[in-house]
Amino acid sequence: MTTIVSVRRNGQVVIGGDGQATLGNTVMKGNVRKVRRLYHDRVIAGFAGGTADAFTLFELFERKLELHQGHLVKAAVELAKDWRTDRMLRKLEALLAVADENASLIITGNGDVVQPENDLIAIGSGGPYAQAAARALLENTELGARDIVEKSLGIAGDICIYTNQFHTIEELASKA
């Protein structure tokens, strides 16, 4: 799997992910970019799960963003509906963490679109470790969103065997 973490703080929203791709118990690649900018660089998205499945979902999500003029929530809901109801899409195994200047969301193949508490997202096999680290840093430090994401990914990479220390991090200015 992987670790993707997103933090929103002090006018910034940041999503970061590690770069490890595994096949069974073998590391196949260590520098996969699991976090991308979409829709004219106004949306950032990260994936946990099968790489091919995730890239398919990125393409579909970008189309939904275009269709709905970049409205993140509407595009996310439409993707989740299609993902849940389409027979072929239902087989895709991935989770998406997406964010724009206004909202941070998790999109699942079960049709869920969740805006998490405190705009903190952590998904993938290292998600629980990254979430615990990010939450502690949010509650007990004045660190910025990027620093929290970097430190959380580092901690997850030290603990989770499916997460490495190659990080891709994207950030946007945030209204929330």
Swiss-Prot record:
Its EC number is 3.4.25.2. PROSITE patterns: PROTEASOME_BETA_2. The active site is at T2. One of its GO terms (cellular component) is proteasome core complex. Keywords: Allosteric enzyme, Cytoplasm, Hydrolase, Metal-binding, Protease, Sodium, Threonine protease. One of its GO terms (molecular function) is threonine-type endopeptidase activity. Na(+) binds at G157, C160, T163. It catalyses: ATP-dependent cleavage of peptide bonds with broad specificity. Allosterically activated by HslU binding. One of its GO terms (biological process) is proteolysis involved in protein catabolic process. The keyword Cytoplasm applies. The keyword Transport does not apply. It is an enzyme of class 3 (hydrolase). InterPro entries: ATP-dep_Prtase_HsIV_su, Ntn_hydrolases_N, Proteasome_sua/b, Proteasome_suB-type. SUPFAM superfamilies: N-terminal nucleophile aminohydrolases (Ntn hydrolases). Its main location: cytoplasm. It is found in: Cytoplasm. NCBIfam families: ATP_dep_HslV (TIGR03692), PRK05456.1 (NF003964). Belongs to the peptidase T1B family. HslV subfamily. Protease subunit of a proteasome-like degradation complex believed to be a general protein degrading machinery. HAMAP family: HslV (MF_00248). A double ring-shaped homohexamer of HslV is capped on each side by a ring-shaped HslU homohexamer. The assembly of the HslU/HslV complex is dependent on binding of ATP. This is ATP-dependent protease subunit HslV.
